[in-house]
């Protein structure tokens, strides 16, 4: 996905894909499953991936592969978004950025093959080239390990207990085959590839005109004076939501809008951030908008539960304007959550 977008947004859509296409060496953009980590070193640890509100481990939501043209140190660059899916919280959000030069310790200098590998099994990859171990439940850094087999790794006691109840108790002795017998913990979101299309620059204006014509047409024989009066009384909230609906009506299945430095598409006039609300990067640079997650993604997550569940109107991600290089690890960036208001 290209960065430094000066034109229209790039739109993301979910598609089913074979598991090999969603592995780290393919540099995927994807939703759900386990993270396809970019750098195999310096992963965010359990404290960084704990919900800032309830303290429980967050689930991987999506990642966007977004290298920066002309930046040798960001030839590979990816953003990873996590959310809390534990009722009744379901509020915590965190996003991390990682980037690598083309010549690095983890990947070939040449582009990855488009052909499937000879072995395309469904084994879960729980060990990285750096030697780091991943949690069997969530695929994040797993510094804890089973005290019996010393082979199964976890991010937390909570995930260790969950895995024990759902099968590791019986599989613990089968230490040579643990990666092939990872149960479904009902913790991960469904996994999809994110495919990208560029939004048409002209069509939004056409749709907006059609939208206005439809509104006027449904008013029947209303007098011109009445129409002018209604236009004057249309609230800012109404205009913002109408713009949102008009934009997404072109591609109603879009789950993501990407454009580094463009303006976000808000769903509401309420709870939109001012410049002072977006914290600067620790390096001192300002943060700018990079992409947003649309509410349409919720339709694919199978996250509905009785009581509170994962929900949002817009998740807007702001990243360091300099895309600074702070070591080989993962740098936390900023997420702004805008909920769907009653007015919308």
Curated annotation (Swiss-Prot):
Zn-finger (MYND-type) residues: 135-172
Keywords, in A-Z order: Apoptosis, DNA-binding, Metal-binding, Nucleus, Ubl conjugation, Zinc, Zinc-finger
Residues that bind Zn(2+) 1: 135, 138, 155, 159
The keyword Cell membrane appears for this protein: no
Predominant localisation class: nucleus
InterPro entries: PDCD2_C (IPR007320), Znf_MYND (IPR002893)
GO cellular component, one term: cytoplasm
Residue numbers binding Zn(2+) 2: 146, 149, 168, 172
GO biological process, one term: apoptotic process
PTM remark: Ubiquitinated by PRKN, promoting proteasomal degradation.
Protein name according to UniProt: Programmed cell death protein 2
Organism: Bos taurus (Bovine)
């Amino acid at each position: 996905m290209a960065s430094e977008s000066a034109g229209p947004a790039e739109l993301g859509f979910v598609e089913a894909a074979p598991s090999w296409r969603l592995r780290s060496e393919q540099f995927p953009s994807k939703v759900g499953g386990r993270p396809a980590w970019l750098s195999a070193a310096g992963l965010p640890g359990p404290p960084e991936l704990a919900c800032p509100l309830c303290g429980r481990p967050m689930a991987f939501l999506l990642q966007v592969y977004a290298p920066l043209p002309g930046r040798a140190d960001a030839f590979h660059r990816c953003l990873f978004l996590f959310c809390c899916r534990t009722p009744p919280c379901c509020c915590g959000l965190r996003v991390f950025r990682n980037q690598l030069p083309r010549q690095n310790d983890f990947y070939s200098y040449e582009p990855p093959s488009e052909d499937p590998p000879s072995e395309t099994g469904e084994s879960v990859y729980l060990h990285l080239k750096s030697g780091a171990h991943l949690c069997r439940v969530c695929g994040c850094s797993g510094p804890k390990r089973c005290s019996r087999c010393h082979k199964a790794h976890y991010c937390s006691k909570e995930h260790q207990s969950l895995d024990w109840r759902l099968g590791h108790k019986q599989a613990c002795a089968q230490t040579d085959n643990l990666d092939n017998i990872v149960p479904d913990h009902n913790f991960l979101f469904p996994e999809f590839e994110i495919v990208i299309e560029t939004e048409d620059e002209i069509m939004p204006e056409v749709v907006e005109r059609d939208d206005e014509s439809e509104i006027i047409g449904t008013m029947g024989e209303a007098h011109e004076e009445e129409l002018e009066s209604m236009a004057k009384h249309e609230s800012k909230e109404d205009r913002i939501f109408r713009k949102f609906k008009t934009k997404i009506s072109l591609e109603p299945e879009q789950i993501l809008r990407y454009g580094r430095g463009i303006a976000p598409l808000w769903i509401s006039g309420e709870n939109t951030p001012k410049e002072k609300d977006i914290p600067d990067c620790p390096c001192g640079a300002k943060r700018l908008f990079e992409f947003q997650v649309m509410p349409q993604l919720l339709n694919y997550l199978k996250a509905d539960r009785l009581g509170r569940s994962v929900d949002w109107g817009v998740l807007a991600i702001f990243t360091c304007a300099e895309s600074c290089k702070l070591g080989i690890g993962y740098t936390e960036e900023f997420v702004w959550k805008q909920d769907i208001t009653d007015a919308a």
